[in-house]
A protein has these predicted regions:
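Short alpha-helical segments that sit at the start of domains
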Residues: 1-18, 24
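Short acidic, hydrophobic short linear motifs in intrinsically disordered regions
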Residues: 24-37
Length: 93
């Protein structure tokens, strides 16, 4: 089914965008729909992608209205995918 393929394709992009929006801080809350919109996803695909990441423990649901946060495992995974924050790059030698 093409939706499942779309979800798999967008998982790393969604996680990295969440990492950037939260600055890797698990206490920061953002809308899954705003993240999806920035990636060109509709609300349904944003929801399904977020649910997939929630199921893996990389993202956690904060409110029933679509507010999510990244977990410490999600931060680790995003970094393994190549995500970094501007200030992290500045301090690397």
């Amino acid at each position: 089914m093409f939706i499942q393929d779309d979800i798999k394709e967008n998982l790393p992009l969604f996680l990295v965008e969440l990492y950037h929006r939260t600055q890797g801080d698990a206490s920061v809350k953002v809308s899954m729909f705003d993240i999806g919109e920035s990636l060109g996803l509709d609300r349904k695909l944003s929801l399904r992608t977020a649910e997939e990441l929630i199921g893996t423990g990389l993202v956690e649901i904060k409110t029933l209205s679509g507010i999510i946060g990244i977990t410490t495992e999600g931060v680790t995974e995003a970094r393994q995918l190549g995500a970094s924050l501007k200030n992290e790059k500045e301090f690397k030698i």
